[in-house]
């Protein structure tokens, strides 16, 4: 039963990450074609920062499941969230310091992935009774 609970969460996280990754790739391609390659690369980096950080969180969040592992579930969620924030800060710092990026597509695709993270779980809700 515990493995089933964790597996369901992992599957939902995989679906969400796939949707985010696909949206980032489409946005990067659109920016590259519509404006230029620098905008496409910047969009890819901005969205990639969010997707990578979110993947790390998902990996930590669904390590444990079940009532017996309640404390470990809470610890893994807090650890995952802390790592997500830290990775986001580090990756944005690296992007700003060592890459010549356009800020508009970088921020727009980051916000696109964030918006998907907020809105897409509604699509996964199953209202069948």
From Swiss-Prot:
- Keyword list, A-Z: Cell inner membrane, Cell membrane, CF(0), Hydrogen ion transport, Ion transport, Membrane, Transmembrane, Transmembrane helix, Transport
State the annotated membrane topology for this chain. Multi-pass membrane protein
Which chain regions cross the lipid bilayer?
Answer: 16-36, 44-64, 77-97, 105-125
Q: Where in the cell is it found?
A: Cell inner membrane
Q: Is-annotated flag, keyword Transport? A: yes
Cellular component (GO) terms are: plasma membrane; proton-transporting ATP synthase complex
Q: Which GO terms describe its biological process?
A: proton transmembrane transport
Superkingdom = Bacteria
Q: Which Pfam families match?
A: ATP-synt_I (PF03899)
Say which family it is in: Belongs to the bacterial AtpI family.
Q: What does this protein do?
A: A possible function for this protein is to guide the assembly of the membrane sector of the ATPase enzyme complex.
Q: Would you tell me the protein name for this molecule?
A: ATP synthase protein I
